[in-house]
Amino acid sequence: MDREHLRRIAHEDLGLPTTPYCFASSYEELEDGAKKVEYPCVVKPVMSSSGHGQSIVRSSENLLEAWNEAQHGRRAAAGHENECSRVIVEALAPLDYELTVLTISSCAGITTCEPIAQRQQDGDYRESWQPANIPESIRTNAKDIAKRAVEGLTDIAQEAGETGWGVYGVELFVLKDGSLLFNELSPRPHDTGMVTMISQHYSEFALHALAILGVPITSNYTELSLKNNEVAASHAIVIKAEGSVGFTNIAQALQSGENNRCNLRIFAKPSVHGHRRMAVSLATGLTQEEARENATRIAMSLKTTQTNA
């Protein structure tokens, strides 16, 4: 994602609430920006995803390390070691939790899915569950911010002769006082949205394809498929290795889902170098805690085999 372009559109053009932020093209500019937004702050490359290159900076003593991490973790860093990537430095929000609102732009206009709650680790998704157990006021505000963001981007796309149709993953911060901030936006299906493969009649991938093909996506398409007030959860299966990875004990893992609906999606990724998300487990439960426990149990029951590179 292009964080600079998106942040300027969201805050400066659309007036959406965000954390204080600055952009920097050099370490010296980063120093100035960090002083403006104040410590603690977060430093990210303007082009990256899944937490790559992101650092929380508590004091000026750690700022150079954060600059170097952003340069190393930026998109397309390999082969461009002598080039500097612009970074965003923003104030560290007094965060309570994060939400993703999958928002669909189609020929029928803008519609949203139920907000998705999540757990992050090192700036990357590890678990998500839907529907999020949140107050109605936060739910309404979250959907409103998401719609405003996607309406603005769709207008820009259409001014350029494109449709702008598809799924957008709008990321929001919920602060301890109950207020919401726009964080980021992915103009595509979102990793936390993989839970929709078990929670909705139409997954985020199906909605993306249908919208692009010109099908009018209304609220009927975004309804949950859960029954009896169930909750659905996903658990990212992240493997640390060097080489090719395979999975065994799959049947036993799926049987560990405590008689609830469950599923497992193994990605067709050829190898791992360091750590990589290689699969996702999906499960339902009568409560948020039960759904998360079931998805985690499936993930932990898997066994891996590795062939060194």
PLM region spans:
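Active-site nucleotide/adenylate-binding loops and adjacent lid/helix of ATP-dependent enzymes
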Residues: 1-154
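A short, glycine/Asx- and small/polar-enriched loop/turn
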Residues: 37-38, 175-181, 275-277
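A short beta-turn/loop motif at secondary-structure boundaries
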Residues: 48-49, 91-95, 173-174, 225-229, ...
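Short beta-strand micro-motifs enriched in acidic
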Residues: 104-106, 173-175, 267
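Protein kinase-like catalytic core scaffold
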Residues: 111, 168, 180-184
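Short, flexible active-site loops
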Residues: 123-133, 184-197
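Active-site "cap" helix and flanking loop/linker of ATP-utilizing ligase/carboxylase catalytic domains
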Residues: 141-170, 176, 186-243
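Peripheral (often C-terminal) accessory segments that flank ATP-dependent C-N-forming ligase machineries
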Residues: 210-309
